[in-house]
A protein has these predicted regions:
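Extreme N-terminal basic, low-complexity initiation segments
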Residues: 1-9
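C-terminal regulatory/interaction module of P-loop NTP-utilizing enzymes
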Residues: 9-303
Protein backbone atom coordinates (compact mmCIF):
# COMPACT_ATOMS: atom_id res chain seq x y z
CA UNK A 1 0.00 0.00 0.00
CA UNK A 2 1.23 3.50 -0.80
CA UNK A 3 2.21 5.36 2.41
CA UNK A 4 -0.54 7.65 3.60
CA UNK A 5 -3.21 5.86 1.56
CA UNK A 6 -6.30 4.74 3.39
CA UNK A 7 -8.40 2.62 1.03
CA UNK A 8 -10.93 -0.18 1.25
CA UNK A 9 -12.81 -2.24 -1.29
CA UNK A 10 -15.73 -0.18 -2.59
CA UNK A 11 -19.06 -1.84 -1.97
CA UNK A 12 -22.47 -0.51 -2.90
CA UNK A 13 -24.86 0.57 -0.11
CA UNK A 14 -26.93 -2.53 -0.89
CA UNK A 15 -23.89 -4.79 -0.38
CA UNK A 16 -22.90 -2.86 2.74
CA UNK A 17 -26.28 -3.63 4.31
CA UNK A 18 -26.27 -7.34 3.53
CA UNK A 19 -29.87 -8.23 4.33
CA UNK A 20 -31.07 -5.62 1.81
CA UNK A 21 -29.04 -7.03 -1.05
CA UNK A 22 -32.06 -8.74 -2.60
CA UNK A 23 -34.46 -5.78 -2.31
CA UNK A 24 -36.04 -4.62 -5.53
CA UNK A 25 -37.63 -1.26 -6.29
CA UNK A 26 -41.09 -2.31 -5.14
CA UNK A 27 -39.74 -3.59 -1.83
CA UNK A 28 -37.93 -0.28 -1.36
CA UNK A 29 -41.21 1.57 -2.01
CA UNK A 30 -42.98 -0.59 0.59
CA UNK A 31 -40.14 -0.12 3.09
CA UNK A 32 -40.30 3.65 2.58
CA UNK A 33 -44.05 3.55 3.20
CA UNK A 34 -43.38 1.81 6.51
CA UNK A 35 -41.36 4.87 7.57
CA UNK A 36 -44.25 7.16 6.63
CA UNK A 37 -42.88 8.25 3.25
CA UNK A 38 -45.24 7.52 0.35
CA UNK A 39 -42.96 7.29 -2.69
CA UNK A 40 -43.85 7.02 -6.34
CA UNK A 41 -42.70 3.91 -8.20
CA UNK A 42 -40.27 5.99 -10.27
CA UNK A 43 -38.60 7.39 -7.13
CA UNK A 44 -38.19 3.91 -5.63
CA UNK A 45 -36.68 2.67 -8.89
CA UNK A 46 -34.29 5.64 -9.00
CA UNK A 47 -33.11 4.83 -5.48
CA UNK A 48 -32.62 1.16 -6.31
CA UNK A 49 -30.60 2.04 -9.41
CA UNK A 50 -28.50 4.57 -7.49
CA UNK A 51 -27.53 1.88 -4.98
CA UNK A 52 -27.04 -0.84 -7.56
CA UNK A 53 -24.89 1.31 -9.86
CA UNK A 54 -23.04 3.22 -7.11
CA UNK A 55 -24.17 6.53 -8.58
CA UNK A 56 -25.41 9.66 -6.80
CA UNK A 57 -29.09 10.50 -7.20
CA UNK A 58 -29.98 14.07 -8.17
CA UNK A 59 -33.46 15.01 -6.96
CA UNK A 60 -34.98 18.15 -8.42
CA UNK A 61 -38.34 19.76 -7.74
CA UNK A 62 -40.19 22.60 -6.08
CA UNK A 63 -39.59 23.25 -2.37
CA UNK A 64 -41.68 21.04 -0.12
CA UNK A 65 -42.24 18.10 -2.47
CA UNK A 66 -40.32 15.68 -0.23
CA UNK A 67 -36.75 15.61 -1.55
CA UNK A 68 -35.04 15.94 1.82
CA UNK A 69 -37.58 13.67 3.51
CA UNK A 70 -36.88 10.96 0.93
CA UNK A 71 -33.22 10.93 1.95
CA UNK A 72 -34.17 10.74 5.64
CA UNK A 73 -36.61 7.91 5.00
CA UNK A 74 -34.06 5.98 2.95
CA UNK A 75 -31.52 6.26 5.77
CA UNK A 76 -34.13 4.70 8.06
CA UNK A 77 -34.82 1.91 5.56
CA UNK A 78 -31.11 1.12 5.24
CA UNK A 79 -30.52 1.54 8.99
CA UNK A 80 -27.66 3.92 8.22
CA UNK A 81 -26.87 7.35 9.65
CA UNK A 82 -27.94 10.35 7.58
CA UNK A 83 -25.11 12.83 7.07
CA UNK A 84 -26.43 16.12 5.75
CA UNK A 85 -24.48 18.87 4.04
CA UNK A 86 -26.68 21.97 3.81
CA UNK A 87 -25.48 24.11 0.92
CA UNK A 88 -25.62 27.89 0.93
CA UNK A 89 -24.11 30.80 -0.95
CA UNK A 90 -20.38 31.01 -0.21
CA UNK A 91 -19.91 27.48 1.15
CA UNK A 92 -16.38 26.22 0.53
CA UNK A 93 -14.33 23.04 0.89
CA UNK A 94 -13.24 23.72 4.48
CA UNK A 95 -16.87 23.94 5.59
CA UNK A 96 -17.88 20.83 3.66
CA UNK A 97 -14.85 18.56 3.93
CA UNK A 98 -12.47 19.21 6.82
CA UNK A 99 -10.64 21.85 8.82
CA UNK A 100 -7.93 21.89 11.45
CA UNK A 101 -8.77 22.51 15.11
CA UNK A 102 -6.64 25.62 15.52
CA UNK A 103 -7.34 26.25 19.24
CA UNK A 104 -6.34 22.67 20.12
CA UNK A 105 -3.21 22.97 17.97
CA UNK A 106 -2.18 26.11 19.88
CA UNK A 107 -2.78 24.33 23.20
CA UNK A 108 -0.62 21.44 21.96
CA UNK A 109 2.25 23.79 21.12
CA UNK A 110 2.05 25.46 24.53
CA UNK A 111 1.90 22.09 26.29
CA UNK A 112 4.93 20.87 24.34
CA UNK A 113 6.88 24.01 25.24
CA UNK A 114 5.89 23.69 28.90
CA UNK A 115 7.11 20.08 28.88
CA UNK A 116 10.50 21.25 27.64
CA UNK A 117 10.12 19.86 24.13
CA UNK A 118 12.33 21.82 21.71
CA UNK A 119 12.22 19.66 18.59
CA UNK A 120 10.47 22.15 16.30
CA UNK A 121 10.11 19.67 13.44
CA UNK A 122 8.45 17.10 15.69
CA UNK A 123 6.10 19.69 17.18
CA UNK A 124 5.13 20.84 13.69
CA UNK A 125 4.62 17.23 12.58
CA UNK A 126 2.40 16.52 15.58
CA UNK A 127 0.24 19.57 14.82
CA UNK A 128 -1.20 17.75 11.82
CA UNK A 129 -2.00 14.54 13.60
CA UNK A 130 -5.42 13.06 12.90
CA UNK A 131 -6.65 14.02 16.39
CA UNK A 132 -6.60 17.69 15.37
CA UNK A 133 -8.63 17.11 12.23
CA UNK A 134 -12.24 18.33 12.24
CA UNK A 135 -14.28 16.10 9.97
CA UNK A 136 -17.01 17.98 8.13
CA UNK A 137 -19.96 16.17 6.46
CA UNK A 138 -18.19 15.02 3.28
CA UNK A 139 -15.21 13.55 5.11
CA UNK A 140 -17.48 11.87 7.67
CA UNK A 141 -19.38 10.29 4.76
CA UNK A 142 -16.13 8.70 3.57
CA UNK A 143 -15.33 7.35 7.02
CA UNK A 144 -18.50 5.33 7.65
CA UNK A 145 -21.36 3.77 5.67
CA UNK A 146 -24.15 6.32 5.50
CA UNK A 147 -26.71 8.13 3.40
CA UNK A 148 -25.12 11.41 2.33
CA UNK A 149 -27.56 14.24 1.66
CA UNK A 150 -26.14 17.24 -0.21
CA UNK A 151 -29.12 19.52 0.26
CA UNK A 152 -30.05 22.48 -1.96
CA UNK A 153 -26.92 22.29 -4.09
CA UNK A 154 -28.40 25.01 -6.31
CA UNK A 155 -27.63 27.51 -3.53
CA UNK A 156 -23.88 26.89 -3.83
CA UNK A 157 -21.66 28.52 -6.45
CA UNK A 158 -19.88 27.15 -9.52
CA UNK A 159 -16.59 26.67 -7.68
CA UNK A 160 -18.23 24.44 -5.08
CA UNK A 161 -19.92 22.40 -7.82
CA UNK A 162 -16.49 21.76 -9.35
CA UNK A 163 -15.25 20.62 -5.95
CA UNK A 164 -18.19 18.23 -5.60
CA UNK A 165 -17.40 16.74 -9.01
CA UNK A 166 -13.99 15.66 -7.74
CA UNK A 167 -15.42 14.12 -4.57
CA UNK A 168 -18.23 12.26 -6.34
CA UNK A 169 -15.96 10.85 -9.03
CA UNK A 170 -14.28 8.28 -6.77
CA UNK A 171 -15.46 9.01 -3.21
CA UNK A 172 -11.95 9.87 -2.09
CA UNK A 173 -10.04 12.96 -1.01
CA UNK A 174 -6.41 13.84 -0.37
CA UNK A 175 -5.41 15.74 2.75
CA UNK A 176 -1.85 16.98 2.14
CA UNK A 177 -0.71 16.49 5.73
CA UNK A 178 -2.26 13.01 6.11
CA UNK A 179 -2.68 11.40 2.70
CA UNK A 180 -5.48 10.00 0.64
CA UNK A 181 -8.70 8.83 2.30
CA UNK A 182 -11.09 6.66 0.28
CA UNK A 183 -14.45 5.28 1.30
CA UNK A 184 -14.78 1.72 2.54
CA UNK A 185 -18.34 1.76 1.27
CA UNK A 186 -19.41 4.65 -0.97
CA UNK A 187 -22.38 6.40 0.61
CA UNK A 188 -25.78 6.44 -0.98
CA UNK A 189 -25.50 10.06 -2.11
CA UNK A 190 -28.58 12.18 -2.72
CA UNK A 191 -28.30 15.72 -4.04
CA UNK A 192 -31.32 18.01 -4.02
CA UNK A 193 -32.13 21.17 -5.95
CA UNK A 194 -35.05 23.59 -5.71
CA UNK A 195 -34.23 24.99 -9.17
CA UNK A 196 -33.34 28.46 -7.90
CA UNK A 197 -30.65 28.34 -10.60
CA UNK A 198 -29.43 25.85 -13.18
CA UNK A 199 -26.94 23.33 -11.83
CA UNK A 200 -24.15 22.62 -14.30
CA UNK A 201 -24.55 19.68 -16.63
CA UNK A 202 -21.17 18.27 -15.56
CA UNK A 203 -22.47 17.64 -12.04
CA UNK A 204 -25.77 16.23 -13.26
CA UNK A 205 -23.91 13.84 -15.58
CA UNK A 206 -22.33 12.22 -12.52
CA UNK A 207 -25.78 11.40 -11.19
CA UNK A 208 -29.01 9.62 -11.92
CA UNK A 209 -31.75 12.22 -12.28
CA UNK A 210 -35.24 12.21 -10.78
CA UNK A 211 -37.77 15.03 -10.81
CA UNK A 212 -40.27 15.06 -7.94
CA UNK A 213 -43.68 16.47 -8.85
CA UNK A 214 -46.34 17.68 -6.47
CA UNK A 215 -48.38 14.58 -5.61
CA UNK A 216 -51.66 13.70 -7.24
CA UNK A 217 -54.81 14.14 -5.14
CA UNK A 218 -54.95 10.40 -4.46
CA UNK A 219 -51.32 10.23 -3.38
CA UNK A 220 -51.64 13.35 -1.24
CA UNK A 221 -54.63 11.82 0.56
CA UNK A 222 -52.51 8.73 1.26
CA UNK A 223 -49.63 10.89 2.50
CA UNK A 224 -51.89 12.89 4.81
CA UNK A 225 -53.59 9.81 6.26
CA UNK A 226 -50.25 8.01 6.65
CA UNK A 227 -48.65 10.88 8.52
CA UNK A 228 -51.79 11.86 10.45
CA UNK A 229 -53.64 8.63 11.29
CA UNK A 230 -56.26 10.49 13.32
CA UNK A 231 -57.60 12.47 10.38
CA UNK A 232 -60.81 11.40 8.65
CA UNK A 233 -60.78 10.31 5.03
CA UNK A 234 -63.31 13.03 4.19
CA UNK A 235 -61.18 15.84 5.64
CA UNK A 236 -58.00 14.46 4.05
CA UNK A 237 -59.80 14.36 0.69
CA UNK A 238 -61.03 17.95 1.08
CA UNK A 239 -57.55 19.16 2.03
CA UNK A 240 -55.92 17.40 -0.93
CA UNK A 241 -58.46 18.66 -3.47
CA UNK A 242 -58.31 22.19 -2.06
CA UNK A 243 -54.51 22.23 -2.15
CA UNK A 244 -54.59 21.05 -5.77
CA UNK A 245 -56.84 24.03 -6.65
CA UNK A 246 -54.56 26.39 -4.73
CA UNK A 247 -51.46 25.19 -6.60
CA UNK A 248 -53.08 26.25 -9.88
CA UNK A 249 -53.20 29.88 -8.73
CA UNK A 250 -50.49 32.39 -9.63
CA UNK A 251 -48.85 32.39 -6.19
CA UNK A 252 -45.53 33.68 -4.96
CA UNK A 253 -44.92 30.27 -3.37
CA UNK A 254 -47.21 27.34 -4.09
CA UNK A 255 -47.62 25.02 -1.09
CA UNK A 256 -45.67 21.77 -1.12
CA UNK A 257 -46.49 18.51 0.57
CA UNK A 258 -44.80 19.69 3.75
CA UNK A 259 -47.15 22.67 3.92
CA UNK A 260 -50.24 20.60 3.16
CA UNK A 261 -49.28 18.30 6.06
CA UNK A 262 -48.84 21.33 8.32
CA UNK A 263 -52.27 22.59 7.26
CA UNK A 264 -53.85 19.19 7.86
CA UNK A 265 -52.28 19.01 11.33
CA UNK A 266 -53.52 22.53 12.09
CA UNK A 267 -57.08 21.75 10.97
CA UNK A 268 -56.98 18.54 13.00
CA UNK A 269 -55.85 20.49 16.07
CA UNK A 270 -58.73 22.93 15.53
CA UNK A 271 -61.18 20.03 15.52
CA UNK A 272 -62.22 20.65 11.92
CA UNK A 273 -64.56 18.26 10.15
CA UNK A 274 -64.44 20.27 6.94
CA UNK A 275 -62.77 23.43 5.67
CA UNK A 276 -65.15 26.25 6.50
CA UNK A 277 -64.23 29.84 5.55
CA UNK A 278 -63.81 30.60 9.26
CA UNK A 279 -61.38 27.71 9.86
CA UNK A 280 -59.54 28.50 6.64
CA UNK A 281 -59.03 32.07 7.83
CA UNK A 282 -57.59 30.82 11.11
CA UNK A 283 -55.30 28.22 9.57
CA UNK A 284 -54.00 29.44 6.20
CA UNK A 285 -50.77 30.63 7.83
CA UNK A 286 -49.79 26.97 8.10
CA UNK A 287 -50.18 26.51 4.35
CA UNK A 288 -49.04 29.82 2.86
CA UNK A 289 -46.25 32.20 3.84
CA UNK A 290 -47.06 35.37 1.90
CA UNK A 291 -49.97 37.72 2.61
CA UNK A 292 -50.72 38.21 -1.10
CA UNK A 293 -51.03 34.43 -1.48
CA UNK A 294 -53.30 34.19 1.56
CA UNK A 295 -55.56 36.91 0.15
CA UNK A 296 -55.85 35.04 -3.16
CA UNK A 297 -56.71 31.77 -1.45
CA UNK A 298 -59.26 33.38 0.87
CA UNK A 299 -61.00 34.77 -2.22
CA UNK A 300 -60.89 31.33 -3.84
CA UNK A 301 -62.38 29.58 -0.81
CA UNK A 302 -65.07 32.22 -0.38
CA UNK A 303 -66.25 31.88 -3.99
Amino acid sequence: MVPGLVRWHLRSPIEATGNLATMDAEEIRVALAATGYVAEESSAMALWLAMKLNKPLFLEGDPGVGKTELARAMATVLDLPLIRLQCYEGIDASQALYDWDFPRQILHVRAAESAGMHDVDQIEHDLYDRRFLLSRPLLRALEEPCVLLIDEVDRADDEFEAFLLEILSDFAITIPEIGRIAAQSPPLTILTSNRTRDVHDALKRRCLYQFLEHPSVEREITIIRTRLPGISEALAHEIATTVERIRKLDLIKAPGTAESLDWAATLLALGARDISPELAGLSLGALLKYQDDIAQVRALLAS
